[in-house]
Amino acid sequence: MKEILVLCPFGVDKGLLSKAARLSSGELRALVPAGEAETAAEYGAGRIFELSAPEIGDESAFAAFLLETIRRWGSRIVLAPATVRMRNIMPMLAWQLDAGLTADCTALRMEGEQLIQTRPAFGNSLMADIRSLSEIQMATVRPGTFRPEKQAAKTPDVQTITYTPDERVKLRSFGSFAQGKPLSQAEIIVAGGMGVGSKAGFEKLEALAKKLGGSLGASRTAVEAGFVPYRCQVGMTGITVCPKLYIAVGISGAVQHLAGMSGSGKVVAINSDPKAPIFDYADYGIVGDWEAVVDKLLKEENL
């Protein structure tokens, strides 16, 4: 039986649960924050552990708590979203469990009882299939990789587990610098490339994203130029997204970038170069000065 445990202590990853439900031939188990059991059940979890915790605090202490929980449940495949905090916690668990861990996967499949984990390698020049030889197989999955799909209705087994952090170590606050929804959850993304040309240009794109109720994205070259922070990067070395609408502004359309937004519903490209590869991928294209187009959209009252 391929029983899979998905660790989502900081928020349900609907896409990852959907994929795990399809992979599992046994019961899909999930650890989720208090109050999110119903959502986890909708996306395939049959046995749900709601985490009651006033705060998580020190990650090493929380990892020790999760370690005992995993051992008690006995799952042989453990998955988690590759968020900032789970990227720290999963290696601690893998070391204690003497398990193989593949980080930042972009695809998963089963061959018998073996989990095949796919991730970019050698500077994103190829995709590597990885098999873990350990008894417990572990992987983190890039957020937004899998499209959320609701599963057949079922009545889940829900249990509450309580975590009390060491009172000697307290997390005073945990803030997010992100504007709007995280990219992996955004339904509308306005993304810019090197063609935008400056931080000031990206401020205009961010204003448009806010007007549309979306989030700001960027190509790797724009991030490396210092126009926007890494959290905005879409692509093989950034975040994989699947919004309903993706507006690509001044983005040429490199393969690495396209791989990160291939799950988008509709793609609108704005570029002054009519031969830009992004137009081959877009549903709608506008050839012209991006700033003039964006200025008109910002002035449009009916958006």
Language model regions located:
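N-terminal glycine-rich FAD/FM-binding segment characteristic of electron-transfer flavoproteins
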Residues: M1-L303
